[in-house]
Amino acid sequence: MADKKKKGSKKGGKKVDPFTRKEWYVVRAPTQFFKSPADNKVGFTPVNRTQGTKLASDGLKGRVYEVSLADMKDDESQVFRKIKLRAEEVEGRNVLTNFYGMDLTSDKLRSLIHKWSTLIECFVDVKTTDGYFLRVFAICFTKKGESQKKKTSYAKTSRVKAIRKKMVDILTETVSSNDLKTVVDYLIGVSLNGVTTNASGFAPTLAEKIRIEGSSIFPIHNVFIRKVKVLKTPKVDAAKLSELYASSATSTIAPTEEVGTAVERTEETTTTA
């Protein structure tokens, strides 16, 4: 005889939308990544509201965001560069981030590979003057000389080693003698009048330095800083972080908390008839 199933309705708990417990913050990046420094917003991020001793800002610090450099600079020529930003401080409803790495898109890397040429790559671990420990990867390819008729452009092992040594020397010297902000300028160079320069428009980028000096050993092209990893970071300095946001829009946004103005209290005097 089959067991009779108990009749009765199953009552489940009322489903609550988890986003009702969250609030949205504006994610901002240093002004050096933008064509217009006043507009340094990269997006929004949700976080649970402050409850008791659990602060919303603690849940935001340390988050890593990946943003296309083309979107920030409004420049389609930089569409293959991806910038990583890490949340360092929270001011009102603004999340202030700093550089945390760079990478190339996979389709860009695949498009660089061609036959009849030699691929040369290297990486270095080096520390900036302000205490950031970086691992920088570089890549380049040999090419045919101007008067070369042979279709292949393979380089001998001795030439490859010489170019690789030159790449390591340039990366080590440039990164170790500058702070993180200047190093980023060398990484995200823009093209001005056909000459590759850094964001300030004065010095060649790291990739351009390697191309110029490496070509004296053997003709090379398609030189790129393939990846940058931030291995160690110093303690966050609020003053230095605020310098990265000079002339930005963060100061024009009202804070989340309403702050009143102090008013002097006047005592009323009573008279008896």
UniProtKB/Swiss-Prot annotation:
<dbReference type="InterPro" id="IPR027500">
    <property type="entry name" value="Ribosomal_eS1_euk"/>
</dbReference>
<dbReference type="GO" id="GO:0022627">
    <property type="term" value="C:cytosolic small ribosomal subunit"/>
</dbReference>
<protein>
    <recommendedName>
        <fullName>Small ribosomal subunit protein eS1</fullName>
    </recommendedName>
</protein>
<comment type="similarity">
    <text>Belongs to the eukaryotic ribosomal protein eS1 family.</text>
</comment>
<dbReference type="GO" id="GO:0006412">
    <property type="term" value="P:translation"/>
</dbReference>
<dbReference type="GO" id="GO:0005829">
    <property type="term" value="C:cytosol"/>
</dbReference>
<dbReference type="GO" id="GO:0031012">
    <property type="term" value="C:extracellular matrix"/>
</dbReference>
<keyword id="KW-0689">Ribosomal protein</keyword>
<dbReference type="Pfam" id="PF01015">
    <property type="entry name" value="Ribosomal_S3Ae"/>
</dbReference>
<dbReference type="GO" id="GO:0003735">
    <property type="term" value="F:structural constituent of ribosome"/>
</dbReference>
<comment type="subunit">
    <text>Component of the small ribosomal subunit. Mature ribosomes consist of a small (40S) and a large (60S) subunit. The 40S subunit contains about 33 different proteins and 1 molecule of RNA (18S). The 60S subunit contains about 49 different proteins and 3 molecules of RNA (25S, 5.8S and 5S).</text>
</comment>
<keyword id="KW-0963">Cytoplasm</keyword>
<keyword id="KW-0687">Ribonucleoprotein</keyword>
<dbReference type="InterPro" id="IPR001593">
    <property type="entry name" value="Ribosomal_eS1"/>
</dbReference>
